[in-house]
Swiss-Prot record:
Residues 64-141 are annotated as: Domain II. InterPro entries: DNA_helicase_Holl-junc_RuvA_I, Hlx-hairpin-Hlx_DNA-bd_motif, NA-bd_OB-fold, RuvA, RuvA_2-like, RuvA_C, RuvA_C_sf. Homotetramer. Forms an RuvA(8)-RuvB(12)-Holliday junction (HJ) complex. HJ DNA is sandwiched between 2 RuvA tetramers; dsDNA enters through RuvA and exits via RuvB. An RuvB hexamer assembles on each DNA strand where it exits the tetramer. Each RuvB hexamer is contacted by two RuvA subunits (via domain III) on 2 adjacent RuvB subunits; this complex drives branch migration. In the full resolvosome a probable DNA-RuvA(4)-RuvB(12)-RuvC(2) complex forms which resolves the HJ. The RuvA-RuvB-RuvC complex processes Holliday junction (HJ) DNA during genetic recombination and DNA repair, while the RuvA-RuvB complex plays an important role in the rescue of blocked DNA replication forks via replication fork reversal (RFR). RuvA specifically binds to HJ cruciform DNA, conferring on it an open structure. The RuvB hexamer acts as an ATP-dependent pump, pulling dsDNA into and through the RuvAB complex. HJ branch migration allows RuvC to scan DNA until it finds its consensus sequence, where it cleaves and resolves the cruciform DNA. It comes from the Bacteria. Has three domains with a flexible linker between the domains II and III and assumes an 'L' shape. Domain III is highly mobile and contacts RuvB. Residues 141 are annotated as: Flexible linker. One of its GO terms (cellular component) is Holliday junction resolvase complex. Residues 1-63 are annotated as: Domain I. It holds the Pfam family HHH_5. Keywords: Cytoplasm, DNA damage, DNA recombination, DNA repair, DNA-binding. The keyword Cytoplasm applies. This is Holliday junction branch migration complex subunit RuvA.
Amino acid sequence: MTVGLIGVVEKISALEVHIEVQGVVYGVQVSMRTASMLQTGQKARLKILQVIKEDAHLLYGFLEESEKILFERLLKINGVGGRIALAILSSFSPNEFENIIATKEVKRLQQVPGIGKKLADKIMVDLIGFFIQDETKPVHNEAFLALESLGFKSAEINPILKKLKPNLSVEEAIKEALQQLRS
């Protein structure tokens, strides 16, 4: 599995960059925000999410881990694919998007190409508990994704994550949360 690429940017378009890594050129799907921060001929380091579908093998690239985490979470929402998730990341930074969800600004979410009222409402409902407002956010968000992938619901996960000690590692947070979820 590819989790990162370091190489020279060969080509930049609105939603894709080509990166040459030791003689191999990779096509990587990126948000317009990410594409605007890269320069042709310059070295780039992207965090990669590899998605393998029946008809395609796709690489999605991110400059920041927070973008990658948000993208992965968006893909779990029924009706949101890579194109819409990239459109969201093209329109808002992860912090801006978090504020939109926290303040329930459905209308702003509907301004993203491909998102109508029904999908905006679904995204809002699915993500309302995902963002935790404190300094332990990265650890809690990663633990949330891991627990969700194990089949737990956000209504079960969030109350437990909020009670955990703030200085835990991701692994410790998952372990403690699992103990509480299974008891």
